[in-house]
Amino acid sequence: MKITIVSFAMAAPFGLIACDNTKHNTLTEQEKAEGWELLFDGETLDGWRDLNGTALTGPWEVVNGTIQADGQGSDASGYIVTDKAYENFELSWDWKISKGGNSGLLYHVVERPQFPVPYVTGPEYQLIDDINFAEPLEDWQRCGVDYAMYLPDFNTIKVHPAGEWNNSKIIFDNGHVTSFMNGHKTVEFDAWSDDW
């Protein structure tokens, strides 16, 4: 499936996009021909900016081939979005989170001054350290949920602990959403439906 998404947003604090000795963030000639796009080149934050902004001011940086936040984000700051708008997509990313960390990947967010945070307009794939978060979590707040909306079967997904790499994927196909964590389906729903 070709990537075509409406702005993604990420919340700090968070480490995103895996890097090891394998060359990541590259496309094969076939993937290029099929229309796939990279959202991160492994070296720069080109293609990203602050939510409702024209440039990227932080707290994000590239460290050893990964996008990382400095941990200074808050509920009202630290959100970055893609420069390009998309519609339907298949997005896969590797990530790890710091001990006690809380973050998320939001999509189809609306950028307008009256919406200073992305979670009031777009669904959030929750990324959080369930074990070490400072406050007790409700099921709708746990890692892998469609935040405050749809819950996975927590018995069928495995989230690696803080500091270890996980892989997540979201497929958005004409309003039908399927999410995955480490190869296991977490949630499936229809966006903008009466239930949603």
Task: Please describe what each predicted stretch is.
Residues 19-196:
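Carbohydrate-interacting regions of secretory-pathway proteins
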